[in-house]
């Protein structure tokens, strides 16, 4: 088992990411949550935070630590993730990033922008070059203007190829001169979880019903009673924001709100899968049928 690896486990809402964690051996790995709502204290039920039982089985980071009034963003997530990775590597443990926030996974893989911003005009120019001339042409351009970057880049990684050329055409400086720090995220095992969409729809309906049964209405009343409202960042999450709509439109019935949560969740699942399907080098599994393969991939 390589202890310098970093594992990504991603998939859409309700696919069953947390369920497989109970099967992980104790003491050899820890989880870093990739979720923009689970970070908030008190917002427990609709965010589907990992249970106390699961957190006692395998330690979770970046869960239930931020006051609801504060914004959580990519910069905080990335900075904290880097610290956690360094700590876990010192302990010879595997960092396992688990969640469904596609935007965060993207920047875990490709890093935060460390070069100057690029104008829309330059970005459009490079993208049009790609559409008209193809990937090989862009690679040849990169070889010409930044041979160091050309030698080190994955030649199937069109995102980084385009980004490298954008920076050069914007600044006249090779991106290799901007990227001096060691990449912490080279040895990535990317595991994607997915189910058929009809199965996902059924699971979402069951999940929302369970939220109501577990006391979501009481949780929201308590949160509103403490002064949290539509300006509170944590209320942006699906399952919370719909109840703010209910408060402003008393004609809505509880069933209308439940149906709206189901609808918004399913639309979010579709957006998540659209993004995740674009990521290269992902090993896709059904979380129920392929559990042994997933465990072997991570721990053997």
UniProtKB/Swiss-Prot annotation:
Highest taxon, organism lineage: Bacteria
InterPro entries in the record: Dimethylallyltransferase, IPT, P-loop_NTPase
Enzyme Commission number(s) of this protein: 2.5.1.75
Coiled-coil stretches noted in the UniProt entry, renumbered to this chain: none
Annotated region described as Interaction with substrate tRNA, given as residue ranges: 35-38
Keyword ATP-binding in record: yes
Site positions for Interaction with substrate tRNA: 101, 123
Positions contributing to substrate binding: 13-18
Record field: catalytic activity: adenosine(37) in tRNA + dimethylallyl diphosphate = N(6)-dimethylallyladenosine(37) in tRNA + diphosphate
KW DNA-binding (keyword) present: no
GO molecular function, one term: tRNA dimethylallyltransferase activity
UniProt GO BP: tRNA modification
Binding-site residues for ATP, renumbered to this chain: 11-18
Cofactor requirements of the protein: Mg(2+)
Keywords: ATP-binding, Magnesium, Nucleotide-binding, Transferase, tRNA processing
Family under the similarity heading: Belongs to the IPP transferase family.
Function: Catalyzes the transfer of a dimethylallyl group onto the adenine at position 37 in tRNAs that read codons beginning with uridine, leading to the formation of N6-(dimethylallyl)adenosine (i(6)A).
Quaternary data: Monomer.
Protein name: tRNA dimethylallyltransferase
Gene assigned in the entry: miaA
């Amino acid at each position: 088992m390589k202890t310098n690896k970093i594992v990504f486990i991603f998939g859409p809402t309700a696919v069953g990411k947390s369920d497989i964690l109970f099967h992980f051996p104790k003491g050899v790995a820890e989880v870093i949550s990739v979720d923009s709502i689970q970070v908030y204290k008190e917002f427990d039920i609709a965010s589907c935070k990992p249970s106390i039982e699961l957190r006692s089985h395998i330690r979770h980071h970046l869960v239930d630590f931020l006051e609801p009034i504060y914004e959580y963003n990519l910069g905080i997530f990335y900075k904290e993730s880097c610290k956690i990775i360094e700590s876990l590597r010192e302990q010879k443990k595997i960092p396992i990033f688990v969640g469904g926030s596609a935007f965060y996974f993207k920047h875990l893989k490709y890093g935060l922008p460390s070069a100057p911003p690029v104008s829309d005009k330059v970005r459009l120019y490079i993208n049009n070059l790609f559409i008209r001339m193809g990937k090989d042409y862009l690679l040849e351009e990169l070889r010409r203007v930044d041979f160091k970057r050309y030698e080190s880049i994955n030649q199937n990684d069109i995102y980084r190829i385009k980004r490298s050329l954008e920076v050069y055409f914007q600044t006249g400086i090779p991106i290799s001169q901007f990227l001096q720090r060691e990449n912490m995220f080279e040895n990535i095992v990317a595991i994607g979880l997915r189910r058929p969409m009809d199965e996902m729809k059924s699971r979402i309906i069951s999940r929302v019903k369970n939220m109501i049964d577990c006391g979501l209405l009481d949780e929201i009343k308590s949160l509103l009673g403490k002064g949290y409202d539509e300006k509170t960042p944590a209320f942006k999450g699906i399952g919370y924001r719909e109840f703010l709509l209910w408060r402003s439109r008393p004609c809505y019935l509880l069933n209308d709100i439940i149906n709206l949560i189901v609808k918004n969740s399913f639309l979010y699942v579709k957006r998540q899968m659209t993004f995740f399907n674009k990521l290269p080098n992902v090993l896709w599994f059904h979380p129920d049928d392929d559990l042994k393969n997933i465990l072997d991939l991570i721990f053997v």
